[in-house]
Regions:
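Conserved anion-binding
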Residues: 50-81, 86-112
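Conserved N-terminal beta1-alpha1 strand-loop-helix module at the mouth
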Residues: 1-60, 66-68, 83
Length: 112
């Protein structure tokens, strides 16, 4: 957690990628943190590897990964298969499970 605070202090912009083209831009950018807002269980591992191979911290938005059930097992899948650094979700159970897996978490909520 301290590493991400240090990285954001130096480079406070976070890249959010929603397609393969934006992944290419993000890995070449100065952003140290990338939020992955797309993918499926078939390709999320490759997407995360590409981001991590560029030396970036990668969060996966679990709610937006096609084919991923929004249950506690989603956190374990994200930690083991794509080996992401963190999870974003609107679901409290997914966030709790991700923390228990040792992942950084962002609990996304909407205010009206």
């Amino acid at each position: 957690m301290n590493r991400i605070k240090e990285l954001l202090a130096v480079s406070p912009i976070i890249a959010a990628v929603k397609d393969s083209e934006s992944v290419e831009y993000a890995v070449r950018s100065d952003c140290d943190v990338v939020f992955t807002l797309f993918g499926s269980i078939c390709d999320i591992g490759e997407i995360v590897r590409k981001i991590k191979d560029a030396g970036k911290i990668c969060f996966v938005h679990a709610d937006l990964v096609e084919g991923l059930a929004l249950k506690e097992t989603a956190a374990r899948f994200i930690k083991e298969n794509p080996a992401a650094d963190g999870v974003i979700s609107t679901k409290p159970a997914v966030i709790k499970a991700a923390r228990e897996q040792g992942l950084m978490t962002i609990h996304r909520c909407f205010l009206l």
